[in-house]
Amino acid sequence: MENISPALLEWFYKNRRSLPFREDPTPYHVWLSEVMLQQTRVSAVLPYYYRFLEALPDIPALAACEEEKLHKLWEGLGYYSRVRNLQKAAKLVCAQYGGQLPADYAALLALPGIGEYTAGAIASISFGLPVPAVDGNVLRVFSRLYNDPGVITEPAVKKAFTARVMEHQPPEKAGDYNQALMELGALVCVPNGAPLCGQCPLAEVCRARAAGTTAQLPQKAKPKPRKIVPVTLALVESPAGFLVQQRPQKGLLAGLWQPVLWEDEHLLQAEVLARLAALGLDTGTAAPAALPAAKHIFTHIEWLMSGVQLHVAAQSAPAGYVWANREQLRTTYTLPGAFRAYKPLLL
């Protein structure tokens, strides 16, 4: 196949979106944007990107940020391990590299939370290094370009596609080339069997288009079935606010805050009241109201939530819990998106 970079770059320079991390592609800006864009659309990321940089304009500021503030800045983006790894890496960068990301692919790859794609994006876009940056968009483009039925989630297939990506990369324009492939996958060679081939600068050399197989590519492994987990919540409100607790520092939703809940259990109202009493909470004669059922899907787990809402008299919080008023829940305590259905009641 002839080299695709001339046609690809010509298209990119005419059609690329104007994005803040492209207009000012410092290593920190590119790093932050790539981490935020994992699992999240550009349109959803931009308000968070601006807000995060306003609060934490450089790597030393990120490294020094308090955990609650960091979580609050990320609230709504989900996948909070991303921001925890951002801070871990920032602390290492301050300790080892004077607060500046190293212009070295291997050194970037050694930082917490930075995988091959993110390291490649920073190294090529910010430092101009001729390295690959292969994400799902790029894999989809090359799967169709070469009409390759390989399962793109398999390491050997990804390695082969990465080699093909590098065959076409102009070393002096590595960053633009990598961004052009990502942009093509995001705007034209889109997923779910609906590529806009009439707008593609590579249509004439695309083997899947010639074979009529674009709708079948790329091939992905069958997803594993999610584990269904029943969850019972109790939104307990007193004059001091709602009763909340911090989740453990490891595991699902680590370090975030939640209402009173019991995982792996679907409890009746009487059982909820008994559990609250066992915590040492005086529920008095309060008549609980049923919460609407809701669900939240994590990568491999699906929560099926139900529960109650009740008001109680002023009293001390049970051990391990705090009372948080609405203002504190808005500004201080980070409630994850898993409780989105109930946030109107809490905020």
Model-predicted regions and their roles:
Residues S5-G198, L202-A211, A215, I228, ...:
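Catalytic cores of DNA base-excision repair glycosylases
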Residues M1-S18, E23, A186-L347:
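Intrinsically disordered, low-complexity, charged terminal extensions of DNA damage-control enzymes
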